[in-house]
């Protein structure tokens, strides 16, 4: 069994870029676009415990800020278990991380994100 710890340096710029885009879009009131960037950051970072947990924390904050009870409640178990599942390599690849989708269901990864993983030299699980 392979244990995952921190996000590789080759992938980190893409992860950080999505978080920065999230912050910018949120600050500009573009909530749908902001959420989309959180989902992309989740897909990029979900294999790595800290990155994965951090995105769920941001999703919880987002849910609180927009007063979405379903998102708030849905993020709590994801915060508790997401990082642990990442650590042992048991993640639903492509899952966008929001409470609007089943937490253990894998999803297809859009081509643009596949290209990011390829450029970074990261194999999808």
What kind of region is each of these model predictions?
Residues 18, 37, 52, 56-59:
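TPR repeat positional signature
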Residues 52, 59-66, 73:
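Internal catalytic or translocation cores that form aromatic/hydrophobic pockets or channels
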